[in-house]
């Protein structure tokens, strides 16, 4: 149920107007992320979400709602309400673990997602890379960063192997191990793109695990594993630049030192993978 309003409302106004019988749950269970809280009424639970990035355009939050509206409930939470700065979705009961599931199980989830109808908007990385450069701390901008940005701009993004709907933020903290199988939360970066881009973006523990995930996916997708791995590798510089730039952007935005550490670590990875 989309609800359009140009006037932002508070949390209390949201609950009293749309969910008067619900109350916030003070003890949060697994499956929630930053900027979310849980409400409950007679055993029914919803997650109330706000945009993670307060500076992002409103259209990005609306796209997340639209993506959830067309995805099957077997892999994503069903949305119930959207309005400016707020979204209410189903709570997914289950465990959120600190490590990825078996690569074959994860490959099955991603392959199923990639068989769904496309969302209708493309993921393009270059505008994001340039935005993060422009919005980063000037003291953190380096000649090397600018050189790599120009190199990618000249090379252009790899041609998609297969174009599908992507989640684009697959890591252990966004996977809910439910009684009915794996499900994904936090769809804020979802869009249409290359399946190899999704596989390249998974937050794996090591190269061996990454290769096995790609091999398991290739088996399901009937693609030669070596061909798929080559395409995944083409996306590595783009993904590492995206991560590094995002960490730099978030550092300037909120000043949390963890983002400097994450950015520095990603820059080191980028130099290794060149």
UniProtKB/Swiss-Prot annotation:
Any GO molecular function: thiamine kinase activity
Ranges in coiled-coil conformation: none
Enzyme Commission number(s) from the entry: 2.7.1.89
Catalytic reactions of this protein: thiamine + ATP = thiamine phosphate + ADP + H(+)
Keywords in alphabetical order: ATP-binding, Kinase, Nucleotide-binding, Transferase
Enzyme class: transferase
Keyword Lyase annotated: no
GO BP terms, alphabetized: thiamine diphosphate biosynthetic process; thiamine metabolic process
Involved pathway(s): Cofactor biosynthesis; thiamine diphosphate biosynthesis; thiamine phosphate from thiamine: step 1/1
TM region positions: none
UniProt-listed HAMAP family: Thiamine_kinase
Family indicated by similarity: Belongs to the thiamine kinase family.
Protein purpose: Catalyzes the ATP-dependent phosphorylation of thiamine to thiamine phosphate. Is involved in thiamine salvage.
Name by which UniProt lists this protein: Thiamine kinase
Species of provenance: Shigella sonnei (strain Ss046)
């Amino acid at each position: 149920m989309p609800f359009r309003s140009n006037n932002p409302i508070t949390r209390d106004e949201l609950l009293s107007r749309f969910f008067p019988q619900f109350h916030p749950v003070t003890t949060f269970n697994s499956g929630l992320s930053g900027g979310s809280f849980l409400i409950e009424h007679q055993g029914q639970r919803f997650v109330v979400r706000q945009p993670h990035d307060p500076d992002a355009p409103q259209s990005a939050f609306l796209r997340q709602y639209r993506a959830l509206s067309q995805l099957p409930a077997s892999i994503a939470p069903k949305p119930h309400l959207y309005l400016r700065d707020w979204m209410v979705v189903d709570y997914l009961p289950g465990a959120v673990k600190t490590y990825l599931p078996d690569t074959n199980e994860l490959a099955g989830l991603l392959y199923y997602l990639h068989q769904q109808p496309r969302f209708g908007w493309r993921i393009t990385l270059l505008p994001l890379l340039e935005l993060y450069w422009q919005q980063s701390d000037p003291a953190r901008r380096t000649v090397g960063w600018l050189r790599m940005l120009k190199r990618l701009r000249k090379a252009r993004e790899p041609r998609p192997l297969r174009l599908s709907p992507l989640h684009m933020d697959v890591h252990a903290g966004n996977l809910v191990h439910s009684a009915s199988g794996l499900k994904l939360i936090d769809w804020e970066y979802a869009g249409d793109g290359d399946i190899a881009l999704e596989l390249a973006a998974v937050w794996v523990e090591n190269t061996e695990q990454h290769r096995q995930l790609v091999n398991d996916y290739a088996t399901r997708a009937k693609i030669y594993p070596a061909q798929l791995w080559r395409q995944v590798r083409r996306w590595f510089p783009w993904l590492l630049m995206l991560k590094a730039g995002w960490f730099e952007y978030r550092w300037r935005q909120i000043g949390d030192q963890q983002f400097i550490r994450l950015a520095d670590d990603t820059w080191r990875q980028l130099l290794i993978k060149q």
